[in-house]
Amino acid sequence: ELAIYAMIWMTFLIAGAVLKRRHGIAVTLVSDLLPSAGRKWVIVAVDTMVLLFALMLVWLCWRWYQPLTLAQTGFDIRAFQGQTFNFIYAENTSTLGIKKFWAWLIVPWFAISLSLHGVSNLVQSLTAMRGRV
């Protein structure tokens, strides 16, 4: 189980860096046929979609973990569960015996890092479109 969680964490950690460097797997059949201006528009569109996905993932993680509600209940897990019917903080892993939310924390981390990288890439793409780079 530890090996599985380690592999999942490494995948999410490297995915953010790969997307920042624009080295992800991509199908470039259409963009290769476009002129330079068209390619720039495709890059901006892709960067926009990545950023929108990342922001949606941040929002979903916020709703999943519900940190404000947890704080409002005084970090009392039972009170939190009773108020929200969200059992994220109570479920244990099968063999390690740790709370699963610790293993799942990679998802909000990835969402935040992807959002930051998405903003950076989009700004870079828009700047390149204006011919400043």
Regions found by a protein language model. Give the residues of each.
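Alpha-helical transmembrane segments and membrane-interface helix-loop junctions
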Residues: 1-133
